[in-house]
């Protein structure tokens, strides 16, 4: 699911919570950020601890607690 956000570093967040992603359905999700259709590879707070740490063209955040995502969306949803 891709959700529009108002954030200085990103304009959308992808949230995946199926069994085929790095998550625990119902408790945590895998997320990624995008700006103008491109991956945001720089860690975004408050999710930096979940950033995959890879250097490259993509960046995902694994096993992010859904409560943390919900709080972020409460403040940043477009």
Briefly describe each language-model feature range.
Residues 1-78:
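Catalytic phosphate/metal-binding cores of nucleic-acid and nucleotide-processing enzymes, i.e., regions
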């Amino acid at each position: 699911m891709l959700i529009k956000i108002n954030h200085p570093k990103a304009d959308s967040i992808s949230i995946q919570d199926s069994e085929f992603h790095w998550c625990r359905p119902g408790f945590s999700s895998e997320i990624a950020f995008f700006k103008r259709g491109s991956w945001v590879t720089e860690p975004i707070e408050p999710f930096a601890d979940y950033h995959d740490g890879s250097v490259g063209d993509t960046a995902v955040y694994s096993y992010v607690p859904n409560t943390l995502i919900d709080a972020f969306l409460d403040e940043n949803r477009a």
